[in-house]
Amino acid sequence: MSEMTPREIVSELDSYIIGQNKAKRAVAIALRNRWRRMQLNEMLRHEVTPKNILMIGPTGVGKTEIARRLAKLANAPFIKVEATKFTEVGYVGKEVDSIIRDLTDAAIKMVRLQSIDKNRTRAEELAEERILDVLIPPAKNNWGQAEEHQEPSSARQAFRKKLREGQLDDKEIEIDLAAAPMGVEIMAPPGMEEMTNQLQSMFQNLGGQKQKPRKLKIKEAFKLLVEEEAAKLVNPEELKEQAIEAVEQHGIVFIDEIDKICKRGGQSSGPDVSREGVQRDLLPLVEGCTVSTKHGMVKTDHILFIASGAFQTASPSDLIPELQGRLPIRVELQALTTEDFERILTEPSASLTEQYKALMGTEGVNIEFTAEGIRRIAEAAWQVNESTENIGARRLHTVLERLMEDISYDASEINGQSITIDADYVRNHLDELVADEDLSRFIL
């Protein structure tokens, strides 16, 4: 679990997301409160429930990007889902309980990787011994079994030294590795994924853990043996317990496009299996219930839920009242301005302009963006957003791709040249498209 302070979290998010300080502060405080809660005594800890967040803002302003970056910072089980993928219980489609099952699977994977990393040193020692056993087989007793507790021979020690120094990396050896589990592809109707997973697990267990001889270079064999030995050192039962504990205490669920499951005012009544029904199914998860997964029972009382939506044709008040009450923290994200677009093009780590420079650099073409050129690109993107559909920062991808089309096409033939993208270059390539609303609607 991350121990970063709210200021550190916001600073890290600033490296990738421009503006939207209110949203960054809200998620930073929520993430820090997870850590604060774990410092309380057990009785009080149980009473402190997470304050779920609803992020409201037009498309392309950074809602999903905040979720992506938060997942990397959280160091906790995290899953992002689209609200539109689910249907009410009893109808064809995914049920909302699958959110918690997927979150638990993510936690199992995360805890397994942590456990493997923790055991890596021991796994490397065991892998080294297995390779040395192939290079210099240990002495055997009268029954043909390897003798235990024998002193390492001088030859074995010499080979160990060579192995550690990489002198034997290219030597080929034959080793026994665990065969890949038997893969059984089962096609199941939507909503039956849990049954499919259980059947696949059953077939894999029936296959048993078979050893398969393989001829590999020592360098490759060592990597595979380390993974195999590290996996053996992981206790499956402990793994499940730790993963379920991590989900219950630190899990974070990000629900995108929640506005798409609102019942908009004035709509006719009747069955609405992918809207209000989904909201009612989400309620127990958000307020706290117990979900059955293949790894065990998971309580959702202390899982943090962050929902987001553009709310262009609906409003947060169109959510059912019970769900509104379970999302107490509201954060509005602002539409992006020309100045924001300018900053997006230059300030974030691996900004769009840096990406294009690096891509063209692989062909030996040197690209330079001037400040005036970047300003004109930002103005063009903002203008198209205003005159057609506002898709936020995603418009920059379209505009830049159009601007760089000729250079990208000719790059292999203009090796060694330098190209400066200034205001005149941008005007020559974009102004006609931007000015013609019909063209910009279809091309930009």
From Swiss-Prot:
It holds the Pfam family AAA. It is found in: Cytoplasm. One of its GO terms (cellular component) is HslUV protease complex. One of its GO terms (molecular function) is ATP binding. Coiled coil: none annotated. The keyword ATP-binding applies. GO terms for biological process: protein unfolding; proteolysis involved in protein catabolic process. Its main location: cytoplasm. Keywords: ATP-binding, Chaperone, Cytoplasm, Nucleotide-binding, Stress response. PANTHER family: ATP-DEPENDENT CLP PROTEASE ATP-BINDING SUBUNIT CLPX-LIKE, MITOCHONDRIAL-RELATED (PTHR48102), ATP-DEPENDENT PROTEASE ATPASE SUBUNIT HSLU (PTHR48102:SF3). Belongs to the ClpX chaperone family. HslU subfamily. A double ring-shaped homohexamer of HslV is capped on each side by a ring-shaped HslU homohexamer. The assembly of the HslU/HslV complex is dependent on binding of ATP. ATPase subunit of a proteasome-like degradation complex; this subunit has chaperone activity. The binding of ATP and its subsequent hydrolysis by HslU are essential for unfolding of protein substrates subsequently hydrolyzed by HslV. HslU recognizes the N-terminal part of its protein substrates and unfolds these before they are guided to HslV for hydrolysis. This is ATP-dependent protease ATPase subunit HslU. It comes from Serratia proteamaculans (strain 568). The gene is hslU.
